[in-house]
Amino acid sequence: MAAPVRTVISPGRYVQGKGSIHQLGEYLKPVGSTPLLVADDLVWGLVGHDVEASLKNAGLPVQRETFRGVPSAKEVDRLVEAIKSSGSDVAVAIGGGSTIDAVKAAGFLADIRWANCPTVASTDAPCSALSVIYTEDGEFEEYRFFPRNPDLVLVDSQVVANAPVDLLVAGVGDALATWLEARATAQSNSNTMAGGLPTLTGTALAKLSWDVLWDNALQAVDAVRDTR
């Protein structure tokens, strides 16, 4: 029997900052030359202009496919066909967890790279190597696991702050819970979804997330509420 190993997986590149969506094109260029942008109409109405301008400034073509709301097997297959017909070499999800999960699954099936630009805090989807697939009626169907994480995750903190405050609160709760999960996994020396025992790096990041949120989350939520 092979000896147990420790492993950690993460996105190829993580970018975060106020106004960083204006640099999306710049960060996409090393990933692919023909991106397909996937966003629903609501999200595109909020950030589409900035995304288009960013890609044009970087000399990249602007091709957009509308996400239809549910990351179902049917929607994933439709996006695969859209990727193939557009000749894209990187699929870019812009939006929440449902959009991101659908694009990751489609990018994997189309055998191209994928990138994520989340617009809310309330999801683990942006950095993970899996997708949650639902039925057309919105009921859970399956998890799909991938051999790699997104090549790029770009988070515009101002866009996230502009989203409904309940989504920020949900994201804070989810991130706090990550430390409890990571601590339990480390103490029990159990395998993680990365395919091995937990690393000191992964466990330390979960603890750091807890510490940062414990010290700052309430003030951050209050600040977002004050801008409403």
Language model feature labels by segment:
Residues 83-120:
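A short, small-residue-rich loop immediately preceding and capping a beta-strand
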Residues 192-228:
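Active-site segments that bind and position negatively charged phosphate/pyrophosphate groups
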